[in-house]
């Protein structure tokens, strides 16, 4: 469907390529599924694939980050977005912090530099940077891309000058009007409710016509 509708850039986001960490933070995908999805996308002709990773996840140090970066280097994506871990209020980690008291949350210059060097080896350069609240190590998120593959959309949405059409449960559509007025249109979060109310979710976006 994506190829049929001429989608030219997609994201396949592992967050980490360490299965132990994925299980710990409640992510339901596996490392193998990430690799399979990437190879499938390549075989279908997608030539601008971004991958997001998070540095500073619980229990991860230089060795774990190296494992993730080596896996990404083998896959050879066109963009990599390196996120410094930020604890969000609604995330599993924030809601169950008592379960993680014995686990360290680390992000350091050394770890960030290892990620940076991998991106350089892949022929990428940094093209955008932004920060969030509660970020590990007081670092920032950095987008890297090969020549001609930068996700300009990322910059536009961070500057809030680009309308966004969101599909699916929990999606948040954003409409930017002339003069800078912004209107958000939220989809319901529960998947079953979204399916049951799909016509309503569509009607909410009539403002985009």
What kind of feature is each model-predicted range?
Residues 1-5, 41, 66, 128-140, ...:
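A broadly tuned preference for mixed-charge, low-complexity surface segments
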Residues 3-4, 20, 28, 88, ...:
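Context-gated lysine
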Residues 13, 18, 48-50, 134, ...:
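Detector for Asparagine
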Residues 90-167:
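A C-terminal junction/extension of Radical SAM enzymes
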Residues 143-209:
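Radical SAM enzyme core and accessory elements
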